[in-house]
């Protein structure tokens, strides 16, 4: 198996040939949603894809797949036992102007998280700075209300002496502008290109240096670029020759 390679062709034919069993730490992919008339935007047979994903992913590896409705529902329903939850990418700029008279403009896109057979996944949360009003001083005692509808333990509890009042665990909202920098109209390399910062955030959240990432519909190669920047290995695949060549050039530069 060769790593840090980009393959041209149908991923359902390439994965069995080039990816070994239980070799991948993270599958990170922007699958075709089937919502446009573009030649490349045809939904891959999900039953065949899941068979390969479950073969190559490690037992505690993560499968991250971009989606938006109605494809999100189709995707989750195709393997509900492996589905964990969704992150929500806030693109800042709205879309869907053609149907603005009939429904709200769309600003969110889903990042669906799956595991192998529902297993626990490796998770390395990128901590966030807490707002001043939400900070709790170290080593201070707090009182929980007795009426606790969420089933949490009531009574007194004490913050840890090692508690860092400046940091909080991440929320599931990911705010990354989809029309600035490399994604503006002049620089964009692919119609559904994702922000490199977003890709790198998710890579940091679920992998460590030296881990292997698979992107079987890589488009312009942003996943591979993020992996390279963060000292991870990658295997990428792309069926469209034009975008395959773009991805190869980005990774060579």
Kindly give the residue locations of the regions a language model identified.
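Core catalytic lobe of class I
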Residues: 1-236, 242-246
């Amino acid at each position: 198996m060769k790593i840090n390679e980009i393959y041209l062709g149908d991923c359902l034919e390439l994965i069995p040939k080039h990816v070994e069993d239980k070799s991948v730490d993270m599958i990170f992919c922007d699958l075709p949603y089937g919502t446009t008339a573009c030649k490349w935007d045809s939904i891959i047979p999900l039953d065949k894809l899941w068979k390969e994903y479950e073969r190559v992913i490690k037992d505690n590896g993560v499968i991250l797949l971009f989606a938006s409705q109605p494809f999100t529902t189709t995707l989750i329903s195709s393997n509900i036992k492996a589905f964990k939850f969704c992150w929500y990418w806030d693109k800042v700029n709205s879309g869907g102007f053609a149907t603005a008279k009939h429904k709200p403009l769309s600003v969110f896109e889903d990042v669906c998280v799956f595991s192998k057979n529902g297993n626990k996944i490796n998770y390395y949360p990128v901590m966030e700075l807490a707002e001043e009003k939400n900070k709790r001083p170290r080593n201070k005692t707090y009182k929980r209300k007795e009426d606790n509808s969420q089933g949490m333990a009531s009574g007194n509890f004490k913050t840890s002496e090692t508690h860092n009042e400046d940091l909080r665990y991440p929320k599931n909202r990911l705010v990354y502008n989809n029309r600035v920098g490399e994604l503006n109209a002049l620089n964009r390399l692919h119609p559904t290109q994702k922000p490199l910062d977003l890709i790198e955030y998710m890579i940091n959240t679920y992998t460590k240096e030296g881990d292997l990432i698979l992107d079987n519909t890589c488009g312009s190669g942003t996943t591979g670029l993020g992996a390279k920047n963060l000292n991870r290995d990658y295997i990428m695949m792309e069926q469209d020759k034009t975008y395959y060549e773009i991805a190869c050039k980005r990774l060579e530069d």
